[in-house]
Amino acid sequence: MHSKPTWLRAKAPAGKVFNETLNTVKLHNLHTVCEEAACPNIGECWNKRHATVMILGSVCTRACAFCNVATGIPDKLDPHEPENLAKAIKKLNLKHVVITSVDRDDLSDGGANQFIRCIEEIRKITSETTIEILTPDFLNKKGAFEAIAIASPDVYNHNIETVPRLYAKIRPRARYFHSLYLLKMVKQINPKLFTKSGLMVGLGETKEEIFQVMDDLRSAEVDFITIGQYLQPTPKHAKIDRYVTPEEFEHYKYIAYSKGFLVVASSPLTRSSYHAEEDFNRLAAAKTST
């Protein structure tokens, strides 16, 4: 394995606010992708009371080569999860919340109704909190993502993850063009929504392939793109091809803006929900000025 460069070293999680966030998450029986995916930014984010909640349990029905979330037979849905999530948001006084999930291919709707219930419960408690959802692809789940789009979260995020050439290796049970279709249809169903997608670099893709993904996302009218370094969670996961330099990330940011994205987050430690509240405010401001 390549030795990790200095620009990828994050502070160890600690501090009073970090512990308060942890306790609130545990008290309300919630899972977070921050913990399950071993995110390097957990210390920084939780010390700002920012946590990305992972609904539909902690066990995924897929086994993507990049992801650290456990794979297996999932538990039954928790009927109290939406209410518990809303209570935690109120306790943490969140202005912006990101909700993601494991893949639930075992459910007839892929878990779409649980996303909708979470949106509804949050809106019952507060109209001040903006809601960003990061969903799986709902492959072969007719009407699933369409129903969520109609429920009107503020941001609909679905990650493209990597370039199409690497899908068979990195994301074998997903389909690149289905993900593009999802993003395009979400915008058509609810044009008021901001749409967002992200990809990892350092897996063996070329710059030209990344530029093509940018073009594909813009063709789907995606507003916001995130680009971050892939980090190998364990030796059994996909290997890192190389570490992309901060200068290259800046170049990707420049190119993405030139292609028409309203907001671009591109850095080694960028993740889908990293600085999500600040980026949402930038997104809203950029939309207003266009």
UniProtKB/Swiss-Prot annotation:
One of its GO terms (cellular component) is cytoplasm. SUPFAM superfamilies: Radical SAM enzymes. Keywords: 4Fe-4S, Cytoplasm, Iron, Iron-sulfur, Metal-binding, S-adenosyl-L-methionine, Transferase. Its EC number is 2.8.1.8. It comes from the Bacteria. Its main location: cytoplasm. [4Fe-4S] cluster 2 binds at residues 60, 64, 67. [4Fe-4S] cluster 1 binds at residues 34, 39, 45, 273. Residues 46-262 form the Radical SAM core domain. SMART domains: Elp3. It catalyses: [[Fe-S] cluster scaffold protein carrying a second [4Fe-4S](2+) cluster] + N(6)-octanoyl-L-lysyl-[protein] + 2 oxidized [2Fe-2S]-[ferredoxin] + 2 S-adenosyl-L-methionine + 4 H(+) = [[Fe-S] cluster scaffold protein] + N(6)-[(R)-dihydrolipoyl]-L-lysyl-[protein] + 4 Fe(3+) + 2 hydrogen sulfide + 2 5'-deoxyadenosine + 2 L-methionine + 2 reduced [2Fe-2S]-[ferredoxin]. GO terms for molecular function: 4 iron, 4 sulfur cluster binding; lipoate synthase activity; metal ion binding. InterPro entries: Aldolase_TIM, Elp3/MiaA/NifB-like_rSAM, LIAS_N, Lipoyl_synth, rSAM. Pathway: Protein modification; protein lipoylation via endogenous pathway; protein N(6)-(lipoyl)lysine from octanoyl-[acyl-carrier-protein]: step 2/2. It is an enzyme of class 2 (transferase). Disulfide bonds: none annotated. Gene3D superfamilies: Aldolase class I (3.20.20.70). Binds 2 [4Fe-4S] clusters per subunit. One cluster is coordinated with 3 cysteines and an exchangeable S-adenosyl-L-methionine. It is found in: Cytoplasm. Transmembrane segments: none annotated. Its cofactor is [4Fe-4S] cluster. Belongs to the radical SAM superfamily. Lipoyl synthase family. This is Lipoyl synthase. It comes from Wolbachia pipientis subsp. Culex pipiens (strain wPip). The lineage of its organism: Bacteria, Pseudomonadati, Pseudomonadota, Alphaproteobacteria, Rickettsiales.
